[in-house]
From Swiss-Prot:
One of its GO terms (molecular function) is chorismate synthase activity. Transmembrane segments: none annotated. It is an enzyme of class 4 (lyase). CDD domains: Chorismate_synthase (cd07304). The gene is aroC. Homotetramer. FMN binds at R131, S132, S133, N243, A244, G288, K303, P304, T305, S306, S307, R329. This reaction introduces a second double bond into the aromatic ring system. It comes from the Bacteria. This is Chorismate synthase. Coiled coil: none annotated.
Length: 365
């Protein structure tokens, strides 16, 4: 299987499977001299790890990261300094239950990658989905923690803005609320609504989709490239690569089709310091594939997980018609834990384009 690497200068390769002994990543192209601690990486993994509420899978994984290469310890014994060589990180799997999947060893779960993996490779790891499992994304979050260190002043944040048909009220948006509830919701008023709704989904053994919004602030103007090297193109590709993502939009996205050119175009003025000031941000911080200096805003839609308790019609690898009912531990809404994953993938795209711009123009330090 190829295509386990993304990025151009800031390159990330992930490896490992859901029920293997470990998973991890190799980050290549990281500039030398970056200073960070293990806690700077672990903080983001702790946001993503399973088993933290009744609304996510009850698989218990500590997701403790080990940095194996690419750094030297400073004199304080805690701060790591990147050397410019590949940074390799490892996360052990400790709570696999492969026996939960024995009944689907030959059966294809509807909506899952079982059938397509078998068609393409002639073999598949049915234990938790193997490489197609969202367990792989823990490594991406670790890589994203490194990416955040590459761009000076970069702040990447995310929030869950919709579960099923239940949306947040954007008038209530408060970043301080995101870490106070199990949904990463910026709207405290919607939390009890989501709790009741997801309890019903969870008890029925079903699942539901969601929408995540990720925002990057501190992105310098001018990174990205026209035509085939667009910043938003690579952001979309990074977000689409996340398990279960079925749609991505930048800025106004699909809503731009409903408004006029007067309403959509971001007007400009000269600020007090002589810099360009935008009066709105419908473009999501990107014009012509190049950043404007405004916050970069993206949203992505996540389908309901295909692992549900209801019996579904399918076939097996012998070509027989079967009914499939998935056992095991699964997220009733995978969109919840996709928030830190989306943040990581956005950070990686921006770090990559930042380094590409620095190499091409020399204007960024």
């Amino acid at each position: 299987m190829s295509h386990n690497t993304f990025g151009h200068l800031f390159r990330v390769t992930t490896w490992g499977e859901s029920h293997g002994p470990a998973l991890g990543c190799v980050v290549d192209g990281c500039p030398p001299g970056l200073r960070f601690t293990l806690a700077d990486i672990q903080t983001w993994l702790d946001k993503r790890k399973p088993g933290q509420s009744r609304f996510v899978t009850q698989r218990r994984e500590d997701d403790l990261v080990k940095v194996l290469s690419g750094v030297m310890l400073d004199d304080d014994g805690e701060t790591m300094i990147s050397t410019g060589t590949p940074i390799s990180m490892l996360i052990e799997n400790t709570d696999q239950r492969s026996k939960d999947y024995s009944e689907i060893a030959k059966r294809y779960r509807p909506g899952h990658a079982d059938y397509t993996y078998d068609v393409k490779y002639g073999i598949r790891d049915y234990r938790g989905g193997g490489r197609s499992s969202a367990r792989e994304t823990a490594a991406r979050v670790a890589a994203g923690a490194i990416a955040r260190q590459v761009v000076p002043g970069l702040v990447v944040r995310g929030a869950l803005v919709q579960i099923g048909k239940h949306r947040i009220d954007r008038a209530n948006w408060d970043w301080a609320e995101v870490g106070k509830n199990p949904f990463f919701s910026p709207d405290p008023a919607v939390v009890p609504v989501w709790e009741e709704y997801l309890d019903g989904i969870r008890k029925a053994g079903s699942s539901i989709g969601a929408i995540v919004e990720v925002i990057a602030e501190g992105v310098p103007a001018g990174i990205g490239a026209p035509i085939y090297g667009k910043l938003d193109q690579d952001i979309a590709a990074n977000l689409m690569s996340i398990n279960a993502v079925k749609g991505v939009e930048i800025g106004n996205g699909f809503a731009a089709a409903e408004i006029s050119g007067e309403d959509n175009a971001d007007e400009m003025r000269v600020g007090a310091g002589g810099d360009a000031v935008f009066l709105s941000n419908n473009a999501g911080g990107i014009l012509g594939g190049i950043s404007t200096g405004q916050p970069v805003v993206a949203r992505f839609a996540i389908k309901p997980t295909s692992s549900i308790l209801s019996e579904r019609r399918s076939i097996d690898s012998d070509g027989k018609e079967v009914d499939v009912r998935t056992k095991g531990r699964h997220d009733p809404c995978v969109g919840i834990r996709a928030v830190p994953i989306g943040e990581a993938m956005l950070a990686c795209a921006i770090a990559d384009h930042y380094l590409r711009d620095r190499g091409q123009t020399g204007r960024l330090k």
